[in-house]
């Protein structure tokens, strides 16, 4: 309903944020909508990496290209002193990307400013476009856009199948 009964107008991209893993949402979407690619988002801890690996496997099985991996909450930045601490582990996403032959798109910190800015209605790239956090998001977005632009275009799923019959 969200995809078929909403007038999206002219979009350059439609990004769908899905829950982790390989549930019905991911499978149904990949079977009913032509998907350009998947960006895998994980946190560095082992249990999250297992879920992310399952997601990668599912997307590969249904023929959805993996555009790369983002490591979310890669490091906690203290709002008082700026100290950086890897409270969920370090480098799990980078290792997973390397072992799985995926591009590592970048790491996002666990930073209270991200939540505060989003809750105020002005995400980091709007609230502080020159800030370090915004620059991380923008670099990831530019990399994904470039990867999409480099893909060969397959519009076959957008057109109905036409059958010509000799019976007239």
Predicted regions: what they are:
Residues 120-135:
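C-terminal boundary of histidine-terminating zinc-finger modules
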Residues 5-8, 12-13, 19-120:
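Conserved catalytic-core segment of NTP-binding enzymes
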Residues 1-15, 20-22, 28, 32, ...:
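Flexible phosphate-sensing "switch/lid" loops adjacent to ATP/NTP-binding sites
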Residues 84, 122, 158-160:
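Generic structural motif recognizing short loop/turn segments at the entrances and edges of beta-strands
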Residues 48, 64, 129-130, 149-150, ...:
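Short, intrinsically disordered/low-complexity patches at protein termini
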